[in-house]
Amino acid sequence: MEAEYVPFFHVGVLVRDIGQAAEDFGQTLGLRFEPVRSAPLVTGETMRFCYSLAGPPYLELVQMAATSLGIWGPEEGEGLHHIAFADPDVPGTCAAFGGQADTVVGGEGGSPRVIFTRPEALHGIRVEYLQSAMVAATFERLRDATR
């Protein structure tokens, strides 16, 4: 059975200490989080993140990291970082934003699987577009974790 999901997938919050943030959000909002995960970026660097088990939309905590992409660095400050959507055509969306989007996870033939718009592209907020298949797999993983 294929998982169902909504295009509005999650809200990303940038944090200094992901373990402490998961504990704080858990105690304050009554949320439970999946274990912290790491993911490779197109630069070869990694990022650390975790999703709430309640959703969609989910709350994603992302630990600050000074990567060469400059998306999650300490200069961004803690707080609301991005909103994320499932996208059936990430390469097309990337092209539509032109120089206002950065690929963070690549796919076959260099085609983008995950992109972030730059803050100036949409009134100071970043928008993350994730390949729909990735969102469906994540949704299924989180749904299974709550069983």
What are these regions (language model features)?
Residues 1-2, 16-23, 27, 50-51, 53-57, 75-147:
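Vicinal oxygen chelate
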Residues 36-38, 67-71:
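A short, acidic/glycine-rich surface segment
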Residues 30-54:
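N-terminal strand-loop-strand beta-hairpin
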Residues 1-22, 78-85, 141-147:
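N-terminal beta-strand motif that seeds the catalytic metal site of vicinal oxygen chelate
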